[in-house]
Amino acid sequence: MPCPSGGHKQWVEEAILLPAEFAKETALFFSGLYVQRLQERSFFMYGYWSKLCRVDLTNKTWKAEDIKDEDLKLLLGGTAFGCKILLEETPAKVDPLSPENKIIFAVGPIQAAKFFPGNAKWSVITKSPLTGTFMDSAGTGAWAPQLKKAGFDALVIEGKSEKPVWLYINDNGVEFKDAADLWGLDSVETSAKIKEILGDKRINALNIGPAGEIMNPIANITCDGHSFAGRGGGGAVMGSKNLKAVAVWGTKECPIADAEGCDKWAKEMFQILHKATETAEGTPSVMTGMEEIGDSPIRYWRGDVWHKGAETIGTPRYTQVLNVKPLPCQNCPVGCHRHIDITLKNGEKLVGNGPEYETLGTMGSGLCIDDLEAISIANDICNRAGVDTISAGSYIGFLTECYEASLISADKIGMVPHFGDPETLLFLVDKIVKNEGIGAYFKDGIRGAAELIGGDAGLEALPRIASRQELVRADLSRRLSVIA
């Protein structure tokens, strides 16, 4: 995607076709409704049930608790409320993988709307096993509106089950289910199996794959097999509690302040977003533009330009080669996710989620790999195992750089790694998701691996982390040098 003469800001606005005045009106609309709620009924918050569901896995019990009005007024949104719970209820020095750590799933008022872009978002908040500090991550799917329909604004899970278990939350409360038949299944298989058990394909479930079960520090949480709360290791926390999945289905309607006005505004947003040319091809459509403005990492943050490679893995070629179809979340016209259907070189079929921009950045430009088939296979391995692709790709880039700097031998890695080599990607991603071989070096994350590999020298070879976690695919320093 060429960068227009107006520069970065113009490119962003043109890419999403969301004029500044419309964004301002949207903000005023929501803030206006919020103020209206406070002025009209200080004791009642529209869009909320003022209820959380607290689950004790150790004792297999649950209870509904009231949420204080002042908390809802102060903390508009699921993430903020989850942060408050974690701060107040979790000891500062708690082991993230101990029963004393809590994992909180929360939604905001917008999830009460029947028809509104963005209401598929849910947040997970816990103490991260990767960073050792607070984490929040967000996913999508129909799970968030269903939690609201079940009568809850948040779900707080504490303790640890003696045996693998999964939860089914509905209008009547919480059911504890034996997860023996689910343990060991990948994230896609788990989602399908739960639908089969409950006899309803509409039911969404958050679940972990095998990586979460072995408490891999970069294990993610999957929703319905196609959306991921990827960062921070939330899947490892679920695994530490022997919690395989949380399914939810509800039929209750949470009151909102102005249902008619909300529906009207949602339709206007849909019309505007449907006109956006980039929504037709999802997040891969930004690959070439991000590389051109210097925002995409190249060669594990050491490279500068990769024009041809970005064009090779970005759209429109991405759409054509991978036989792409949109995979939108509930009530969202943007359609970030892509569904792919391809026949691999070995004759096997690969059908499922296609790699999005962050994955193209970490496993494509970040490793200088322009092979869409290899990137798609690696993406599928991570998705099914339940692993964050950003961290996994960063691990591979780091290992390759350490090998080139003679900090680690090919024998220890299990192969001779190279940038631009699809085989390096496929070999190492398999080791990383399983914590096997060289993958076991990352049992404490990339910083721990750096210390194991080269001590101080290993740490010096370790760029671009924050609080022990790898950065997203946005190279600010490179962008500034390109713009300058």
Mark where each language-model region is.
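Leucine-biased recognition of intrinsically disordered, low-complexity hydrophobic segments
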Residues: 17-18, 28, 33, 38
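Residue-level detector of intrinsically disordered terminal segments
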Residues: 8-10, 44
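Residue-identity detector for glycine
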Residues: 6-7, 32
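Charged/polar low-complexity intrinsically disordered segments
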Residues: 13-14, 23-25, 39
